[in-house]
Structure formats: C-alpha cells, structure tokens
Amino acid sequence: MTVVLRLPRELRPELRRPWGTLYPRPSIKTYRRLHEESEVLITVGDMTTRSFLRCSIRPDVAVVDRKMLRTVPVDPGNKFPVTLDVNNPPGTITREAWDTVRRGIDYALDGDATLIDVTGEEDLLAIPAILIAPENSIVCYGLPGEGMVAARVTQHLKDSVLRLLTRFRGYDEWKSRSWISGITPCCTAKR
C-alpha cells in the first residue's frame, strides 16, 4: 500500500503564507540573482518555471504539471537533460512524488538539470523540495494572485515546514514506514 500525505482543509490558509521573499513582479535581475545565489535552484509550478526559462535561466530542478491555473497547457521544451514522470493527485504528496523530488535533486547535484513532469498536481511538492534540498538552495513557487515566492533553504525553514507536514493526514503512518522505504522527513540529498 502506498503511503500518501493528504493536505487537511484547515491547513490551506497556512499554505497561502509565503515561506520566503514574495516578489509581486520579479525582474530579470531578480531571476538572475536568485540563480547565482542558490546552491540548487528549484522551481515548483509552470508559471514560475516558464518565467525563469524566459530569462534564459534553466532551474536545476523544475517541477511542473504542464498547466497554469489548472487549465492552460505549458511546454518547457527540451531544455532539461533529465525528465522524471510521476503521478501525484491534487492535495497530496505521494511517496513516489517525494522520492522523485529527491532523485531530481540528486541529479541536479551531479550536474544534470531535471524536469519533474507531474500528472495530477505539483503544488505541494515545494514541501519535499525544501526538506530535501541542501541548505542555501532556493525553492521558488507561485502564490496565485500575489506573485512568486523565493524560499532560501535553511535549517529553520526545514523545521517550520516539517512542523506543518506533521499535521498532514497520513503523517504518522508515513513516518513509521519511512525507514523501510529509505525516506525520512528531513532527508537531505547527497552533497
């Protein structure tokens, strides 16, 4: 049986708060600075990924579902040497999606930019990206109607995100099985 973390309805407002700096209208200089300052640059979401690509900046890891606001197809092209496909239903983080984010970050640390193509919904995959990425990485994601958030990965941010994750449905089962599957809530990709 696959362990799935499910977002409870009561946590949705908390996820609307930015975990980093909110950029209502990022400039090309902002995109370049974020790229230069990051250990690993991870984008979650089609609009965010497309915005970096339009500035000729390829994220180290891009997580997309090829839709913007659930409707418009987005094609990141063939700009990524590695593409990983995964299913992740809306409002969830599956074990497979978590492991795929980890693999994508591992590829990026080895020098291979990776596109993670999600069937379903990618929105919540910023959570494993933050928990897995090495410190000083930057995870960028969109906040609908607000702009783009750039979250610099620190131990403090990882601790905050983990506290939120413990409130997801299925967390206790996931935590109890994580040693079997080789994943842990605060796992760090190889450096």
Swiss-Prot record:
One Pfam family it belongs to: DUF359
Residues that hold GTP according to the record: 46, 65, 67, 122
Gene Ontology BP annotations: coenzyme A biosynthetic process
One example GO MF annotation: GTP binding
Pathway: Cofactor biosynthesis; coenzyme A biosynthesis
EC annotation from Swiss-Prot or TrEMBL: 2.7.1.237
Matches recorded under InterPro entries: GTP-dep_dephospho-CoA_kin
Catalytic reaction equation(s): 3'-dephospho-CoA + GTP = GDP + CoA + H(+)
Family per similarity comment: Belongs to the GTP-dependent DPCK family.
Function comment: Catalyzes the GTP-dependent phosphorylation of the 3'-hydroxyl group of dephosphocoenzyme A to form coenzyme A (CoA).
The protein's name in its UniProt record: GTP-dependent dephospho-CoA kinase
Organism of this sequence: Methanopyrus kandleri (strain AV19 / DSM 6324 / JCM 9639 / NBRC 100938)
